[in-house]
Amino acid sequence: MVAIMTGEPEAFSLEKRYGQAEAVLCSAMSIWETVRAVARKRKVGVAVAHAEVETFIADFALRLIAIGESETREAIMAHERYCKGNHPAKLNMGDCFAYACAKTNGAELLYKGNDFALTDLA
């Protein structure tokens, strides 16, 4: 979401993938991270960034999923397998939860960079 919203070089290809996906899911944690990153990168207030993220979510018909017991368990397992210091993927907390939400819900993980490419979801 951040790459598209802030016009990063990968924005066009990611936007195309969002448009082609059967369903695009996100969690409250990914929304929080996106709001924080958009506010920082675009030098706008959190309220402005939040409104922009909400518009993005509506435009792409993203479906908010809850982080429940299964997602939590998967995130912990992802941390054990792929965290910084243990694996070249170097997943951080937000990455582990994105991984867990995708894996638990049988969804394709839309990402940029090489971190997730080094996991079993690639």
What kind of region is each of these model predictions?
Residues M1-M29, K41-T55, L121:
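Short, well-structured N-terminal submotif of metal-dependent ribonuclease cores
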Residues Y18, A58, K103:
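Anion (oxyanion) recognition and catalysis
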Residues C26-S27, L91-N92, G113:
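Histidine- and aromatic-rich ligand-binding microenvironments
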Residues A28-R36:
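Short, conserved active-site loops that position catalytic residues or coordinate cofactors/metal ions
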Residues V35, A39-S70:
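Active-site-proximal, substrate-binding regions of enzyme catalytic domains
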Residues R63-E108:
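Active-site neighborhoods of divalent-metal-dependent phosphate/nucleic-acid chemistry enzymes
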Residues I76, L121-A122:
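Short Asp/Glu-rich motifs
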Residues L110-L118:
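Gly/Pro- and small hydrophobic-enriched strand-loop and loop-to-helix capping segments
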